Amino acid sequence: METEGLSPMLYEDDYYYGNETGLQPCDETDWDFSYSLLPVFYMIVFVLGLSGNGVVIFTVWKSKPKRRSADTYIGNLALADLAFVVTLPLWATYTALGFHWPFGSALCKLSSYLVLLNMFASVFCLTCLSFDRYLAIVHSLSSAKLRSRSSIIVSLAVIWLFSGLLALPSLILRDTRVEGNNTICDLDFSGVSSKENENFWIGGLSILTTVPGFLLPLLLMTIFYCFIGGKVTMHFQNLKKEEQKKKRLLKIIITLVVVFAICWLPFHILKTIHFLDLMGFLELSCSTQNIIVSLHPYATCLAYVNSCLNPFLYAFFDLRFRSQCFFFFGFKKVLQGHLSNTSSSLSAQTQKSEIHSLATKV
């Protein structure tokens, strides 16, 4: 199936790429394989993301009396991911139909907006969660006001407001139009720019997604976790009985940052290369363009996978949160066995330290 007039670089899951802009005329990429494979990926992410984030939201909601500051950020992170994954059946259908959008203009705008809203809100929640853990571990005594309930509410309000504003271009500019035999969901700059200046709009929107949506959060999270790792190492260096706990904490910290980078880095690298080509800083051959075009949808899928990994990375690695999940879903025997195994392997002093850590540090 051909996509007449549709630049493959516009692969519709990159919500800020423009149509047929900045690319030299090249042979079209064969999308037949992607039309079959990508919808399957989308639906797998949909099922895992819907169930995983749903469990997180339910658990956070049920544990309100004992909710920690980290739990509040985890719940909002899950809400942001959930708002995105519910749109995946639409994008799966769109791809399976060969980039034909049968759902109308309103859903085109709303679905595109939710994707960008998720990207920003999710990244900002992760950054605030990292900052909260940094304060709890590195400045546990002096950060009480910054980690108070009112401060968390204000920070969440800022997260959602800022995310909503950054995602507005998608809501305003995205619309449906007929392209050959297909109706596509695409960015339309005709109301704000001439055809000659579209590249500048696309370049600006590309920077808008990459800098505040990836580079700055990744830099901040790396800094926070470096301080956390240093503090944990100093705290446990003379406590041999805590050696395994130290290694576990450091492993989780490293995993959080690495998984985030792995999921999003390929997407932003390809988008940056396209931006540099668009603005004339690079002159890519047709073969190079075709490689980028072929890799781009799968880099996008990898970024989407982060929405179904987050519940496991940021919630189920947490002993206290995992215990709450078992309790609220009626797995009391599993919980009792888990606590029994934990008790048999820890000394009384270590248990006391563990309980204190779970209650105040994470």
From Swiss-Prot:
Localization annotation: Cell membrane
Topology feature Cytoplasmic, residues: 59-76, 132-151, 221-248, 318-362
GO molecular function, one term: apelin receptor activity
Location (main, coarse): membrane
Disulfide bonds: C26-C286, C108-C185
Protein keywords: Angiogenesis, Cell membrane, Developmental protein, Differentiation, Disulfide bond, G-protein coupled receptor, Gastrulation, Glycoprotein, Membrane, Receptor, Transducer, Transmembrane, Transmembrane helix
Topology in membrane: Multi-pass membrane protein
Positions in the Extracellular compartment: 1-37, 98-110, 173-199, 270-296
Tissue expr: Expressed in all blood vessels including the posterior cardinal vein, intersomitic veins and the vitelline vein network. At the gastrula stage, exclusively expressed in the mesodermal layer and at the neurula stage in the lateral plate mesoderm. Larval expression is observed in the endothelium of the primary blood vessels and the forming heart.
Function, in words: G protein-coupled receptor for peptide hormones apelin (apln) and apelin receptor early endogenous ligand (apela), that plays a role in the regulation of normal cardiovascular function and fluid homeostasis. When acting as apelin receptor, activates both G(i) protein pathway that inhibits adenylate cyclase activity, and the beta-arrestin pathway that promotes internalization of the receptor. Also functions as mechanoreceptor that is activated by pathological stimuli in a G-protein-independent fashion to induce beta-arrestin signaling, hence eliciting cardiac hypertrophy.
Family affiliation: Belongs to the G-protein coupled receptor 1 family.
Protein's recorded name: Apelin receptor A
Native organism: Xenopus laevis
